[in-house]
Amino acid sequence: MSTEHRRSRHRTTEAEPSPQDLEAQQEHRRLERRTLLKQALGLGGACAAAGWLSLAPAEWPLSLRDPDGERGKPKPRLRSLPAGGFAVPDVPSVADLAVAHGTKHKEMLKGALDALGGIGRFIKKGDVVVIKPNVAFERPAALGATTNPEVLVALIELVREAGAREVRVADNPIESPESCFVRSGIQAATQAAGARLYLPAPNEFSMLGTPGATWIERWPFFWGPFEGANKVIGVSPIKDHNLCRASMTTKNWYGLLGGRRNQFHQDIHGIIADLALMLRPTFVVLDATRVLFRSGPTGGNLGDVKPGNTLVVSRDSLAADAYGWDQLLERKGEALPAYFEKSAARQLGQPDWRKLSLRELSVG
């Protein structure tokens, strides 16, 4: 059989495609063309959109522009303090305000705390306690601008004897922190009493939320020492202040703020009222062993300081401050600084200390 004959025979045995098969093949080709066209258009649109977004203003939500590199940084975690602060429950049968006079600081402090129900009311075994002194300036304690280190030692010892697992001392001074802690004697006192000192390194700060605050609803806060803490005590000197008229236990919390806090001087009473809202302590100690009665808050002259030989202890910082204003700065009859009214309007304390239960004692 010839080759040509075999080819002819083979062609006649192949099945011819049906009209339905031909139509299906054509439809498949049309779908493929449409799919390719859509993909091409989609890719072109995405490229065009990306090009446009790369040119859109940086503040636009979908803009791809990031001239400062901020978009790639993680958002800071917003911290919060306990809703009820660090306060302990009320005990109706004890004093609200205790005033101890004398020169033996530990005995004075213990006596004042006993009048409020005893140190055991405030500090339990296993507590982690933050103590906030005022170490704002590079001054020796004798000038009255910073917390008396002897009072701090007495306070740390009482807290540790009550069973605290850890005691932390922290402040963010206005002047050089290292120099302030050394010159004031607070560093040596902290170490001698067995507490841990926190210096305000940048990584110790976090953004804190304070709902309802006027100035610091979201503000950098000295968070490091507060991590895991469940009790907070403020211990601050009593002193004249050229802006807010007096710096005492409520103003003391200013030393926990970071950022550009000097801007708050434009509304000093407003920021102090915010501080009262921000932090509600376990108790406060108004250190009036010395009284800086003029040239505050920095002082600098022994002639501006007088002996006070007094410690005021309360859960209510407004009450402690108001007592200090009237009786220790001896400004009774003068109107209280405006932060008292602003804080009281938020129900953050009682500036009329005479309405509270007061216990006064002399020790040594």
Where are these regions (language model features)?
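N-terminal secretory signal peptides
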Residues: M1-L31
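Small/flexible residues
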Residues: R7-T13, L31-T35, N134, A170, ...
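A periodicity- and composition-biased signal for non-globular, repetitive helical segments
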Residues: T13-P17, Q39, E138, L257
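N-terminal export signals
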Residues: S18, R29, T35-A58
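Short alpha-helical segments used as structural interaction elements across diverse proteins
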Residues: R30-L31, T35-L36, V129, M248
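Hydrophobic alpha-helical segments, especially transmembrane helices
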Residues: R34-T35, Q39-A40, P133, N252
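Extended, low-polarity segments enriched in aliphatic/aromatic residues
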Residues: A50-L143, T147-D171, E175-G364
